[in-house]
Structure formats: C-alpha cells, structure tokens
Amino acid sequence: YYASRGLGDVYKRQLTTRHDRYTVFSLWDTFRNVHPFFTLAYPQKQLDMVQTLIDMYKEWGWLPRWELYGNETLTMSGDPAIIMLADTWLRGLKKFDAETAYEAMIKSATAPGSENILRTDNDDYMKLGYVPLREQFDNSVSHALEYYLADFALSRFAESLGHKEDAQTFAKRSLGYKHYYCKEFGTLRPI
C-alpha cells in the first residue's frame, strides 16, 4: 500500500516486533471503548498492541489509523493512534517506548498537509485553528473534531513526559472546536 504512495516498498521492510504482534486496528472506532477496556481487563495485550503501533511507526514512518493485515488503509478520519497511546500511558500502563511514541505523535500532529498521510488538511488546521469547508459534504468539521481530541490527548501525554511547552501548545489547539459552535442553532457547523 505505501509503495503506491511513494513511501517505500512494503514487501521489503524489516519487521521490528519482539513481542506478540497485532493487526486489523480499526483505531477510529476502537480508541473510544475497546482499548480503554483492554487497559483494565487485558493490560499485557494492550501493551503489546501499543508496542505494535510503535513498531509500525518505525517500519512505515507513521502511526496507523485503520491498519488492515499489515497495510494502512487510510480509511476514516482523524489521528486516533495518538489518543490510544496517550490513554494507555495515562491509565498507568507505561512499559512501552514512550519517547518513540511521542516522536511519532509530534510528527503526525505537526507535519505539513502535503507530507502528512494522516492529516492532509493540517496546513489550514495549524494556521487557522480549524479545517475550513472547501466543498459541500467535505467532512471538515469531523476531521477537525478528531484532531482536537488527538491534540488534547497529546497535550496530556506531553505534560506527563515533562514537555511543558508542547503540552501548552496542544492544549490550546484542542480548544479550536469553539470555532465551529453556532449560538443561533446550538450546534457545531462548517465554516
């Protein structure tokens, strides 16, 4: 899959896993309930899954969003691996490579859109604090809301690692959802 995007030949990559390796991550769906549950009920499996994500970053250069049998599908939106990794750490499961995880999170949250396979609209998001509506039904609000969640999780993770300036930056960015709030209708709307 990555070969078609010019990011390397997936068939020649060296796997880095030294533990149970997992696949078929539907992180867009599972970061909300499955992975928090695993931190409580199956902590070792959760740690192996976390390390699998970090290994995928080492192999591919990006955290996965919706990985399927060793290939990133880029299905759905957002940056859910950040949330899953940070949530695991903040719940006290810390036996994983936090600095590499942090490096991967920062890359995803800050790389320009033209270079970013997870946040292709990151230029507007970083400059304006939101993703503007470009065409009807473009999902700009849902993209940005997913980024705000990831940035909040990243701010908490950064704070726990002692990266205070990054923590403040991402906490501030996470409040951008307020751009979308429409008082007249009491809902979030595209801008």
Regions found by a protein language model. Name each.
Residues 19-26, 70-78, 136-147:
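Solvent-exposed loop and edge beta-strand segments that line ligand/cofactor-binding
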Residues 12-16, 60-68, 124-140:
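Acidic/His metal-coordination segments adjacent to aromatic residues that form catalytic metal sites
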Residues 45-125, 185, 189-191:
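Helix-terminus loop motifs that line ligand-binding clefts
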Residues 26-30, 42-46, 77-82, 94, ...:
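Active-site-proximal structural scaffolding
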Residues 64, 155, 161-191:
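Catalytic cores of carbohydrate-active enzymes
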Residues 1-7, 11:
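Single conserved hydrophobic/aromatic residue that forms the stacking wall/gate
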Residues 23-46, 86-91, 152-161:
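Alpha-helical support elements that line or immediately flank enzyme active sites
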Residues 39-42, 54-58, 90, 159-160, ...:
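Sec-exported extracytoplasmic/periplasmic mature domains
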